[in-house]
C-alpha cells in the first residue's frame, strides 16, 4: 500500500517538475512555441531558441533597430532583463554573428501560483465533488493536478491514523474544468483532497480533509406543483418529488421545508412538511402565491439544499362564507314565498360554518387537551390526599392502648380505672 502511495506521489512530482521546467533555458512545456515567462520585479533570462547553448548572439526588440545586447556580452545565447516590468513584455529577436536569424522569443510576465481555494460537496451518500479557484490571478497559463486518498481511524482513543489508502487521481469532469468527482465513496470514511496549482513559475498545493457527513448537501427537490383546493379559497396544495440524484433506498430519507408568500409580499412563511406534500391553510384569497421547497438529510447530516425553482398557484375562487347573522336578524328578515318550480331554499343554520373554524381547530384542540391535563392532575392529587388520610386513620384505629390523655375528656368519671364507686 505504501509503495503504491509513494509511486503515484513520485509520478505527480515528476509531472509538476516537467511543467515547471519553464524556468530552464528555452522551455517548451507551456503555451505556444517561443513564449517564455518571468515575474515582474525579478531578473528575467531569455534564450535564443535557434542556436546552440553558449553561442554568442545579438538581441533586438521586434521592430526596433536598437541593439539591446551584443555578442560580446559574455552571456552567450541568453538575454538578461534586470527587474523586468510590463514595458519589457513583447517579442525579441536574436541573430547569430553572421547576421542570420536565430529565432524570436515572446516574453510574458506573471506571478507564481498561490494555494488554490478548494471546497467539496456531496449530493448523496456515495459520491462527492470538489471545486477550486485560484486565490490570486497569476496572469500565466495554469494547470491543476488533483488526487485524493482515504483515511481510516484506528480507534476512538487513538489520535493516530492508519496509513492512508491511495492516493488515486481525482478525474476532472469535464477535462480541464475546475471540478473533480470521487465516485463510490464510503459514508463513514474521511478523505484528503490534494489540489496542486502549477504554472511556468512554480507549483502550490492545497490539502483538504473532508467527511461525507459534513459536506452532504442534497440537490433541491424536483417536480414542485402548486394547486388550488376546490371550494376552499384560502388553501393551496403543494407536492414535489425526491431529487433524481438521491439514492432510492428506504434508510436514506430526506426531510423538507417549504416556504410560501403572496405576490408582492416580501416575507416568506416557513413550514416543515411530514411528507412529499403540504396543504397551505392560510393563503390570501384571490392572490397568486410563490412556493419553494428545499431538502436535507433526515438525521440532520450536512446542510440544507438550495431552494427549488419557485412554483406559483392561486387559491380557488369559491365564495368566502359571510358572517353568521345575529339571532334577532334571523327572525326579523321577511319571508319569501318559494316558487312552485324551484326547490325550497335551505334554512339558515345557527351552527358556524365549518370553513370558518378551520384556522381555529388546532387552537381549540390544544386548549381542550390542556384543560383535560390540568383536571387529570388535580384529580390525581385529590385522590392521593384522600388515600393518605384514610390510611392514617386506619392505622390509628388499630393501635392497641390509647395514649395517656387521649380521649380522656369523653370517658365518664365513674368508668375510669381506679375511680371509687360512689
UniProtKB/Swiss-Prot annotation:
<dbReference type="InterPro" id="IPR036116">
    <property type="entry name" value="FN3_sf"/>
</dbReference>
<dbReference type="InterPro" id="IPR013783">
    <property type="entry name" value="Ig-like_fold"/>
</dbReference>
<dbReference type="InterPro" id="IPR007110">
    <property type="entry name" value="Ig-like_dom"/>
</dbReference>
<dbReference type="InterPro" id="IPR003530">
    <property type="entry name" value="Hematopoietin_rcpt_L_F3_CS"/>
</dbReference>
<feature type="signal peptide">
    <location>
        <begin position="1"/>
        <end position="22"/>
    </location>
</feature>
<comment type="similarity">
    <text>Belongs to the type I cytokine receptor family. Type 3 subfamily.</text>
</comment>
<dbReference type="GO" id="GO:0007566">
    <property type="term" value="P:embryo implantation"/>
</dbReference>
<feature type="glycosylation site" description="N-linked (GlcNAc...) asparagine">
    <location>
        <position position="194"/>
    </location>
</feature>
<dbReference type="GO" id="GO:0019221">
    <property type="term" value="P:cytokine-mediated signaling pathway"/>
</dbReference>
<keyword id="KW-0472">Membrane</keyword>
<comment type="function">
    <text>Receptor for interleukin-11 (IL11). The receptor systems for IL6, LIF, OSM, CNTF, IL11 and CT1 can utilize IL6ST for initiating signal transmission. The IL11/IL11RA/IL6ST complex may be involved in the control of proliferation and/or differentiation of skeletogenic progenitor or other mesenchymal cells. Essential for the normal development of craniofacial bones and teeth. Restricts suture fusion and tooth number.</text>
</comment>
<dbReference type="GO" id="GO:0004921">
    <property type="term" value="F:interleukin-11 receptor activity"/>
</dbReference>
<feature type="domain" description="Fibronectin type-III 2">
    <location>
        <begin position="220"/>
        <end position="317"/>
    </location>
</feature>
<keyword id="KW-0325">Glycoprotein</keyword>
<feature type="compositionally biased region" description="Basic and acidic residues">
    <location>
        <begin position="413"/>
        <end position="422"/>
    </location>
</feature>
<dbReference type="GO" id="GO:0038154">
    <property type="term" value="P:interleukin-11-mediated signaling pathway"/>
</dbReference>
<dbReference type="InterPro" id="IPR003599">
    <property type="entry name" value="Ig_sub"/>
</dbReference>
<dbReference type="GO" id="GO:0043235">
    <property type="term" value="C:receptor complex"/>
</dbReference>
<dbReference type="GO" id="GO:0004888">
    <property type="term" value="F:transmembrane signaling receptor activity"/>
</dbReference>
<dbReference type="InterPro" id="IPR053073">
    <property type="entry name" value="IL11/IL27_subunit_beta"/>
</dbReference>
<keyword id="KW-0812">Transmembrane</keyword>
<feature type="topological domain" description="Extracellular">
    <location>
        <begin position="24"/>
        <end position="370"/>
    </location>
</feature>
<keyword id="KW-0732">Signal</keyword>
<keyword id="KW-1015">Disulfide bond</keyword>
<feature type="region of interest" description="Disordered">
    <location>
        <begin position="335"/>
        <end position="355"/>
    </location>
</feature>
<dbReference type="InterPro" id="IPR003961">
    <property type="entry name" value="FN3_dom"/>
</dbReference>
<keyword id="KW-0989">Craniosynostosis</keyword>
<keyword id="KW-0675">Receptor</keyword>
<feature type="glycosylation site" description="N-linked (GlcNAc...) asparagine">
    <location>
        <position position="127"/>
    </location>
</feature>
<dbReference type="GO" id="GO:0009897">
    <property type="term" value="C:external side of plasma membrane"/>
</dbReference>
<dbReference type="GO" id="GO:0060322">
    <property type="term" value="P:head development"/>
</dbReference>
<dbReference type="GO" id="GO:0005576">
    <property type="term" value="C:extracellular region"/>
</dbReference>
<feature type="disulfide bond">
    <location>
        <begin position="120"/>
        <end position="130"/>
    </location>
</feature>
<protein>
    <recommendedName>
        <fullName>Interleukin-11 receptor subunit alpha</fullName>
    </recommendedName>
</protein>
<dbReference type="InterPro" id="IPR036179">
    <property type="entry name" value="Ig-like_dom_sf"/>
</dbReference>
<dbReference type="GO" id="GO:0019970">
    <property type="term" value="F:interleukin-11 binding"/>
</dbReference>
<feature type="domain" description="Ig-like C2-type">
    <location>
        <begin position="27"/>
        <end position="110"/>
    </location>
</feature>
<keyword id="KW-1133">Transmembrane helix</keyword>
<feature type="domain" description="Fibronectin type-III 1">
    <location>
        <begin position="112"/>
        <end position="219"/>
    </location>
</feature>
<comment type="subunit">
    <text>On IL11 binding, forms a multimer complex with IL6ST/gp130.</text>
</comment>
<keyword id="KW-0393">Immunoglobulin domain</keyword>
<feature type="short sequence motif" description="WSXWS motif">
    <location>
        <begin position="304"/>
        <end position="308"/>
    </location>
</feature>
Amino acid at each position: 500500500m505504501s509503495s503504491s502511495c509513494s509511486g503515484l506521489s513520485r509520478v505527480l512530482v515528476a509531472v509538476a517538475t516537467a511543467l515547471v521546467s519553464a524556468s530552464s533555458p528555452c522551455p517548451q512545456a507551456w503555451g505556444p512555441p517561443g513564449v517564455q515567462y518571468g515575474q515582474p520585479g525579478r531578473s528575467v533570462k531569455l534564450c535564443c531558441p535557434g542556436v546552440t547553448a553558449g553561442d554568442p548572439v545579438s538581441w533586438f526588440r521586434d521592430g526596433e533597430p536598437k541593439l539591446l545586447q551584443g555578442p560580446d556580452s559574455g552571456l552567450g545565447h541568453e538575454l538578461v532583463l534586470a527587474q523586468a516590468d510590463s514595458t519589457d513584455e513583447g517579442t525579441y529577436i536574436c541573430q547569430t554573428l553572421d547576421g542570420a536569424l536565430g529565432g524570436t522569443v515572446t516574453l510574458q510576465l506573471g506571478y507564481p501560483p498561490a494555494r488554490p481555494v478548494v471546497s467539496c460537496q456531496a449530493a448523496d451518500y456515495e459520491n462527492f465533488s470538489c471545486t477550486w479557484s485560484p486565490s490570486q490571478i497569476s496572469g500565466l497559463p495554469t494547470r491543476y493536478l488533483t488526487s485524493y486518498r482515504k483515511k481510516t481511524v484506528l480507534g476512538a482513543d487513538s489520535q493516530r491514523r492508519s496509513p492512508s489508502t491511495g492516493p488515486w487521481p481525482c478525474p476532472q469532469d469535464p477535462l480541464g474544468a475546475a471540478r473533480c468527482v470521487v465516485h463510490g465513496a464510503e459514508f463513514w470514511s474521511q478523505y484528503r483532497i490534494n489540489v496542486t496549482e502549477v504554472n511556468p513559475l512554480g507549483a502550490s498545493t492545497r490539502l483538504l480533509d473532508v467527511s461525507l457527513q459534513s459536506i452532504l448537501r442534497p440537490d433541491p427537490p424536483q417536480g414542485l406543483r402548486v394547486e388550488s383546493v376546490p371550494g376552499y379559497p384560502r388553501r393551496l396544495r403543494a407536492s414535489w418529488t425526491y431529487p433524481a440524484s438521491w439514492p432510492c433506498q428506504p434508510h436514506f430519507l430526506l426531510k423538507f421545508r417549504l416556504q410560501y408568500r403572496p405576490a408582492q409580499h416580501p416575507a416568506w412563511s416557513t413550514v416543515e412538511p411530514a411528507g412529499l406534500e403540504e396543504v397551505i391553510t392560510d393563503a390570501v384569497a384571490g392572490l397568486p402565491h410563490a412556493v419553494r421547497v428545499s431538502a436535507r438529510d433526515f438525521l440532520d447530516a450536512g446542510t440544507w439544499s438550495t431552494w427549488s425553482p419557485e412554483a406559483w398557484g392561486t387559491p380557488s375562487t369559491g365564495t368566502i362564507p359571510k358572517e353568521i347573522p345575529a339571532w334577532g336578524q334571523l327572525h326579523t328578515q321577511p319571508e319569501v314565498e318559494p316558487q312552485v318550480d324551484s326547490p325550497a331554499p335551505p334554512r339558515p343554520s345557527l351552527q358556524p360554518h365549518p370553513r370558518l373554524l378551520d384556522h381555529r381547530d388546532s387552537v381549540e384542540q390544544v386548549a381542550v387537551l390542556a384543560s383535560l391535563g390540568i383536571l387529570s392532575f388535580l384529580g390525581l392529587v385529590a385522590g392521593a390526599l384522600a388515600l393518605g388520610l384514610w390510611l392514617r386513620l386506619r392505622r390509628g384505629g388499630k393501635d392497641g392502648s390509647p395514649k395517656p390523655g387521649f380521649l380522656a375528656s369523653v370517658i365518664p368519671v365513674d368508668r375510669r380505672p381506679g375511680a371509687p364507686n360512689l
